[in-house]
Each structure stands twice: as C-alpha cells, then as structure tokens.
A protein has these predicted regions:
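Bacterial N-terminal signal peptides that target proteins for export
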Residues: 1-12
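General secretory precursor processing signal
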Residues: 16, 62, 143-144
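C-terminal segment of classical bacterial N-terminal signal peptides
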Residues: 16-26
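Secreted/processed peptides and extracellular or luminal domains of membrane proteins
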Residues: 19, 65-68, 146
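N-terminal secretory signal peptides
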Residues: 28-98, 130
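Acidic, glycine-rich flexible loop segments
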Residues: 91-150
Length: 150
C-alpha cells in the first residue's frame, strides 16, 4: 500500500533523512564502490563492512513512473541474508517522532535482486500495537539511486 498523501511523503523524507544523516555522520568514507550485484553479493559473503548510499530522487515510486523524493544519504546495516532465489535482504528499524509529534517505529527494508533491481520499503508502525499505519515503496537500481560501498 503506497500512500500518495503529501504530508506522508514529507514525513517519510524527514525520517529517512534523519536515519541517513545519523548513519553517514558515524562512519568514514568506504574504499570501493560496488558496480553490480555479483560484487555486492561477494562483499556480503566475505563479511565486508558495506554501506549503502541512497538517492531516492533517482528511484521511482513502486509500480509507477513518478520520481522519489529529494532524499540522499548513507546507511550501514548489521546483517545481510542471501535467500534461495539469490535476493539479498537487509533491514533496519528505529524509534522516532514524526512532524505531527506522533511517536512511531520506522522499519526500512531493502531487497537487492540478481538483475540489479533494489526494492526499498519504509513502514511506520504503531509503538503500541505494532500495526503498520503507513508505508511507501520505491524501485531503484544498483548505481541508479542505490550504490554500495565497502
């Protein structure tokens, strides 16, 4: 379910910007840029310290042609999982307060496919019931909105 409400997109951008800024301020610049799925998968299996730089304006809203919001930054993840279909999945979550002063848990998940497609999903969850209250999805490509560094 993709909400196209302007205030939701703004709130998503604010929260993503906070996560991305926090992650990027706590790390040094990585040595290598990942040019494709195969080198990313190898880095994951080799236990490399991988960082994702994200530019949602170079991605599209899931299932459509509209560009994503003007949000850029970097994120580190603690764990990666290569699934049976070779999709690489990873996620992070954090507690935050939206611009309307509503407390939420935000869940960010990523799936990288062998063809280089990257699915980005953000979901706001109620901290009381853990039910999803809002979510958005974006379609990116390795090197086009989503770049991996190690």
């Amino acid at each position: 379910m993709l909400h196209r409400n302007g205030s939701f997109i703004f709130a998503t951008c604010v929260v993503l910007t906070g996560v991305i800024r926090h992650a990027s301020m706590s790390t040094a610049v990585a040595e290598d840029v990942n040019p494709n799925y195969a080198s990313f998968a190898k880095a994951v299996l080799d236990g490399r310290n991988v960082r994702l730089t994200l530019d949602l304006a170079r991605c599209t809203a899931h299932g459509g042609e509209a560009r994503g919001p003007q949000v850029r930054g970097s994120i580190r993840f603690d764990a990666y999982m290569i699934q049976g279909d070779q999709t690489i999945a990873f996620a992070t979550t954090h507690f935050t307060v939206r611009t309307d002063n509503t407390a939420v848990d935000e869940f960010l998940s990523f799936r990288v496919h062998p063809n280089g497609k990257v699915d980005v999903r953000t979901a706001f969850l109620s901290p009381i019931t853990f039910s999803v209250t809002q979510e958005s999805e974006f379609d990116c490509d390795i090197g086009q909105g989503a770049t991996f560094h190690w």
